[in-house]
Amino acid sequence: EKTLETVKLAKMNIAVNGLRGDIKQSITYYEDPHESFGKFDYVLANPPFNVDDVNLGKVEQDKRFNTYGIPRNKSKTKKKGEETCPNGNYLWINLFATSLKEDGRAALVMANSASDARHSEANIRKSLIENNLIYGMLTLPSNMFYTVTLPATLWFFDKAKTDDRILFIDAKNIFTPIDRAHREFSEEQVQNIAVISRLHKDNRESYVELVHSYFQNGFSRLKVYGSSLKDVSKKVTGFLAEYKVKNIPNFSPVIDSAKTLLEGFQKYDKNYSADNIDKSNKEQVKLALNVKPFFEALHQLLKTVDKEVRHIEKDNSGSKDIKALKTELEELHREVKETEYFFAHINWLQDRFPDARYDDVTGLCKLATIDEIKEQDYSLNPGRYVGVVIEEDGKTEEEFIEEMLSMNDELTKLNADAQKLESTITHNIKQIAG
């Protein structure tokens, strides 16, 4: 790390978290305190993007940076007689590639632009591909970092790979929103992406184990939710009867269905074995198909209940009973969402890899041959290989309405703020003008 203050912070971070590390102050481009060439089994890195003031003369003879070629197109002069590299992206890529042992592996975060960079950088990329260093490329969603808004890609190196194909994964549509401006991967999304690579390596057991863990989590929540559903159903039925609703929704079929599903899971769980992958996968697909109608019926039931409660609320808006019931229904919706969460991940996996085997999936992943990569001028942009598919957002009608109302509230607030600013600006201009 080149900045002393950051070195101190990093050392403090290591100390307070009980980690080990050897952090030194130096400028990586010009110094090599770790003697890194061919030294490391693993490298994980998130270097700065697009550094444009690296002195070309100081790095072009360094084997850490020139083994696969030096970026030198469109070099510019910062000081008289000092030629600089166009940017440092491919210096970092070179550094991490040359730091690996013969069977070493690396993962690094890099600006999206590096995947398609042209001229000398394209030649470096071609050299890396032809030397079979690159295992895979993964496009990240935007707004994944708090301080960097640029879209980024993960590069994976594996010097021990024997297959010359490259795995491309486009994960830009896989994310969990934190707020309007920031996103993250949930733990389940990380596992779903990782299992693509494991399937590519023919590790099918990890796939059925992951699906099995989702079933365990989902059904444990369904068991708890089933009890809540019984309690709320009694209150809803009594409430609607009190207000003389003619067609009171019947909760019994859904409650019975939940009980049947739990019994089916217990039977599946008792016989589950990851050793027999094809049999386990077949049983998992069958179990998931039984779950889908349950949630469809449940959502339809709750939609009907919400509609009836809204009609009653129009004429009795101040009723404490209605407010209390609405609170319980909101809690019920939250529990449904939490319960359905793990089953949604099961559906996501089974829709794309129904046989528990790797397969190219349009819009998600592609195992590209060297000839296919040559056709794309050695681009490493996953979007060029995986294709595009238009997917539905997966929201229920209630979730869509809730999101629209939330966005409308935000727009109303922004419009009010804009009017205040407009008045303030007008007032200030008049004050200045006298």
Residue spans of the language-model regions?
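S-adenosyl-L-methionine
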Residues: 3-38
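A conserved structural/catalytic subdomain of Rossmann-like adenosyl-cofactor enzymes
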Residues: 37, 41-431
